[in-house]
């Protein structure tokens, strides 16, 4: 089969806030163009991870090729890239957008524009996309299409007068969306005779085929048996299979300019496939790679340890397999005195961390402990040397530190004005600095600069609870700012517990220290001797709780008789306890770790 001429191809992605009906619209487009038979249609076809279906969110970007016979009688090939809407997966979004020429902007006609819609639209505008606004859920009684169109124009600055009004659930007006794609989006550009340049959009692991690579061809052709080279790593592979998604893998003879498809090349490790890399022909390589690719930088780090130490190897293999699918996730081995062997893992954000943890426990059946999430600090020593600090336990002695810088973010929060006061109070409690506050209709848009350290723990949950779930939140990294930060160590029976150490601003150090000590007092089982649970900054103890001893009734078998007999036994017990306190080891149960780490917020 010869590849499709470029003027009949349209590559587009769907951008939307969480829950505005993006995956449902994708389902309808697949159904209308008949890419899957009625028997194979399931809800959210493109969300193929269980977690994605359960939480109703899209995590991995997915693609599908649709054939559509338009009103002008020509049959067009539409390549749909379904992108995630959540802020943590902005990296997946940026790659999908780089592979397309246009976007459908889906906005819920009853909710209006939300924070993540904005973030993704700006990314699409940066990628020079033609954007077609689509109002979804028009069948709801609460839908206000005119108000939302006005809002799109006011907030984003897009002309929404000819926005397509649809209901993805009932399938209303889906044809109009397909026509808009064909008439309003530009075809891809590309030169078939130039040296091969293809962008590696995503890669995942298949136990039969090895690594499957999702590619977007810019120039040249990709065909079976061709030897290709990855430009960033220099690895050379021979292509076994070329094809497209419908959403099932469908082999083709070759892929030409503008087409999106997959290749397999018996690649064993995904480490060879850097997402966003340029693939070129080994014999006639392109001179320079495609622009528009930035490697992802982890923002949040935490330690992952197996509950059962024997599972360490299993955890290592599982992480390696996940890394195959998720290029934005990093890990390195580390050890902890309290938790044994484990890994220090880097994530794009908290939802990303939660999902990786959940995938490890589901797909690989692992029981894990995660230490408190921390951000990357920059530590400047008195010697003038700068080190990056991923783990609070590695922080050197205070005397050698000149100053510490912490990452700040720029957060955009959209909230109905009834809840604005509570949201502003929350931001101020978290050391936020207000940058901007504007009103659009009855919704306020607040822009704040916040230290990432304060956001990492539970900012998102608190934001949702103070705004009754109406606020939406999006952020991008700003820069590093010097801060008065201290490391708080937790000591149990005079022994520091490395897994519980954390870094906080001096102003909140005391309250956090007290809270953790009080929590641990309830969680650690009582021993036969008294235990002190302390929080300390350097050598200064800032909080203490004492866990009382269990006492065994040693005088139980003395009946009556002389008091000195009882006293002798009690003295003996006291001696023993004193000795135990000196040499006794306190085992902290795993449940205590989990609960203490959860409450760090």
Swiss-Prot record:
Annotated EC: 3.6.5.n1
Membrane topology annotation: Peripheral membrane protein
One Pfam family named in its UniProt record: GTP_EFTU
Record GO cellular component, one term: plasma membrane
Catalytic reaction(s) noted: GTP + H2O = GDP + phosphate + H(+)
Every tr-type G domain range: 7-189
Annotated localization: Cell inner membrane
First-listed, main subcellular location of the protein, grouped into a coarse class: membrane
GO biological process: one example: positive regulation of translation
SUPFAM superfamilies on file: EF-G C-terminal domain-like, P-loop containing nucleoside triphosphate hydrolases
UniProt entry keywords in alphabetical sequence: Cell inner membrane, Cell membrane, GTP-binding, Hydrolase, Membrane, Nucleotide-binding, Protein biosynthesis
PROSITE patterns: G_TR_1, G_TR_2
Positions contributing to GTP binding: 19-24, 136-139
Function text: Required for accurate and efficient protein synthesis under certain stress conditions. May act as a fidelity factor of the translation reaction, by catalyzing a one-codon backward translocation of tRNAs on improperly translocated ribosomes. Back-translocation proceeds from a post-translocation (POST) complex to a pre-translocation (PRE) complex, thus giving elongation factor G a second chance to translocate the tRNAs correctly. Binds to ribosomes in a GTP-dependent manner.
Protein family according to the UniProt entry: Belongs to the TRAFAC class translation factor GTPase superfamily. Classic translation factor GTPase family. LepA subfamily.
NCBIfam families: lepA, small_GTP
HAMAP family per UniProt: LepA
Protein name as catalogued: Elongation factor 4
Organism: Acidiphilium cryptum (strain JF-5)
Organism classification: Bacteria, Pseudomonadati, Pseudomonadota, Alphaproteobacteria, Acetobacterales
Gene assigned in the entry: lepA
């Amino acid at each position: 089969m010869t590849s499709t001429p470029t003027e009949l191809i349209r590559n587009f992605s769907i951008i939307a806030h969480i829950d505005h009906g993006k995956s449902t619209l994708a389902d309808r487009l697949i159904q209308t163009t008949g890419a899957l038979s009625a028997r194979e249609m399931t809800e959210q076809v493109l969300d193929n991870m269980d977690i994605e279906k359960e939480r109703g969110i899209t995590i991995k970007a997915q693609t599908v090729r649709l054939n559509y016979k338009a009103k002008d009688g020509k049959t067009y090939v539409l390549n749909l890239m379904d992108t995630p809407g959540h802020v943590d997966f902005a990296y997946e979004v940026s790659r999908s957008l780089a592979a397309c020429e246009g976007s459908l902007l889906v906005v819920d006609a009853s909710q209006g524009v939300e924070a993540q819609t904005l973030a993704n639209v700006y990314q699409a505008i940066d990628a020079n996309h033609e954007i077609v606004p689509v109002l979804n859920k028009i069948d709801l009684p609460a839908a206000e299409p005119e108000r939302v169109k006005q809002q799109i124009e006011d907030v984003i600055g897009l002309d929404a007068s000819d926005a397509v009004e649809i209901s993805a659930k009932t399938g209303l007006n889906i044809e109009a969306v397909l026509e808009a794609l064909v008439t309003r989006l530009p075809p891809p550009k590309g030169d078939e005779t130039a040296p091969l340049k293809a962008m590696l959009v995503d890669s995942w692991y298949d136990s039969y085929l090895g690594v499957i690579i999702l590619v977007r061809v810019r120039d040249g052709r990709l065909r079976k048996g061709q030897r290709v080279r990855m430009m960033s790593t220099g690895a050379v592979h021979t292509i076994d299979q070329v094809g497209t998604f419908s959403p099932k893998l469908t082999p083709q003879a070759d892929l030409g300019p503008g087409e999106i498809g997959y290749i397999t090349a018996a690649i064993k490790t995904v480490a060879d496939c850097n997402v966003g890399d340029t693939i070129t022909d080994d014999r006639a390589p392109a001179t320079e790679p495609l622009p528009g690719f930035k490697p992802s930088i982890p923002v949040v780090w935490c330690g992952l340890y197996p509950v059962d130490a024997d599972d360490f190897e299993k955890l290592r293999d599982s992480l390696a397999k996940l890394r195959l699918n998720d290029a934005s996730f990093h890990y390195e081995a580390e050890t902890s005195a309290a938790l044994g062997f484990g890994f220090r893992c880097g994530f794009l954000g908290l939802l990303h961390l939660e999902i990786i943890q959940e995938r490890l426990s589901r797909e690989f059946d692992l029981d894990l402990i995660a230490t408190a999430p921390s951000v990357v600090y920059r530590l400047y020593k008195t010697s003038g040397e700068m080190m990056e600090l991923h783990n609070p336990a590695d922080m050197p002695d205070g005397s050698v530190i000149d100053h510490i810088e912490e990452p700040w973010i720029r957060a955009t929060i959209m909230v109905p004005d009834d809840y604005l006061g509570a949201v502003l109070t929350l931001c101020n409690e978290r050391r936020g600095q207000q940058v901007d506050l504007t009103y659009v209709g009855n919704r306020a848009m607040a822009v704040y600069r916040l230290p990432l350290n304060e956001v990492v723990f539970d900012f998102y949950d608190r934001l949702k609870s103070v705004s009754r779930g109406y606020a939406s939140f999006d952020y991008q990294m700003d820069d590093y700012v010097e801060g008065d930060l201290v490391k708080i160590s937790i000591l149990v029976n005079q022994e520091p517990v490395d897994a519980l150490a954390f870094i906080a601003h001096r102003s909140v150090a005391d309250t956090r220290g007290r809270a953790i000590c009080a929590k641990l007092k309830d969680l650690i089982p009582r021993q036969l001797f008294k235990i002190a649970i302390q929080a300390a900054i350097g050598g200064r103890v800032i909080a203490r709780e004492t866990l009382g001893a269990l006492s065994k009734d040693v005088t139980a078998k003395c009946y009556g008789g002389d008091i000195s007999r009882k006293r002798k036994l009690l003295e003996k017990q006291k001696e023993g306890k004193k000795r135990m306190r000196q040499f006794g080891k306190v085992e902290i149960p795993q449940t205590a770790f989990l609960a203490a780490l959860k409450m760090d917020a």
